């Protein structure tokens, strides 16, 4: 098998943007994490609605991500990113040598 055929057989990785409006949205986020998707979660609508519900949702998503060996981080004030195994989120404290 040559390199080109190996690349074409690899399944694509998808990036999905999701707006969290309610705690129940965590279920679809869980499914997408298990599928190995890169997720950009917009949390502002849920934050405006109920901060305690947002905190609970973020804690649950964090737990799901860690159990799937995914990486998770905040992107500014309004978003969270979740990446699958093999995709790490750069943080300022990392040494990229």
Each language-model region and where it sits:
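Helix-rich interaction surfaces within compact, conserved domain-sized segments
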Residues: 1-3, 64-97
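N-terminal intrinsically disordered, cationic/polar leader segments
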Residues: 1-35
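Flexible beta-alpha connector loops of hexameric P-loop NTPases
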Residues: 15-19, 46-53
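Short glycine-rich, basic-tinged beta-strand/loop micro-motifs
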Residues: 33-46
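Charged helix-capping and loop-helix junction motifs
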Residues: 55-58
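Residue-level signature of catalytic and energy-coupling elements of molecular machines
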Residues: 61
């Amino acid at each position: 098998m040559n390199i080109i055929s190996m690349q074409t057989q690899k399944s694509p990785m998808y990036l999905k943007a999701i707006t969290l409006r309610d705690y129940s949205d965590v279920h679809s986020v869980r499914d997408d994490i298990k599928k190995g998707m890169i997720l950009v979660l917009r949390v502002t609508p849920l934050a405006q609605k109920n901060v305690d519900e947002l905190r609970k949702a973020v804690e649950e998503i964090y737990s799901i991500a860690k159990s799937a060996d995914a990486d998770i981080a905040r992107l500014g004030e309004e978003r969270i990113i979740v990446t699958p195994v093999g995709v790490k989120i750069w943080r300022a404290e990392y040494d990229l040598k």
